[in-house]
Amino acid sequence: MTESEVLAKLAAQALDEKKGIDVQILDMRNLQSAPAAFFVIASGNVPSHVSALSDHVHEVVKKATGLNPSKVEGYMNAEWILMDYFDVVVHIFLQPKREFYRLEQLWEDAERMR
């Protein structure tokens, strides 16, 4: 298992621990135009849940690996938080935003790991 795969699974586990909704891991490694090796995608019920999910992913990944995300976007409005760990990008949405952007359909050729 690669370091990136371990990180993706760790992020998904952290999202599960805080009741993230419909947590998925997309393996993008076989896609030519993919911006990362893995996407981890989840939803929260309300903005405070989305923020709490992001905080927990950050805490769990930092404790286990020592890594901080290179960039975090969307934290202030907490409708779609993107956490960039280079080869792993974590997307945490409010459900309506997830339904609107449909990342799983956009990257439908990616292998679903869960």
PLM feature spans:
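Active-site beta-strand termini and strand-to-loop segments that position acidic
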Residues: 83-85
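Conserved acidic residues
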Residues: 37, 87
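Polybasic/polar functional segments that serve as interface/processing modules
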Residues: 1-35, 43-81, 95-97, 103-114
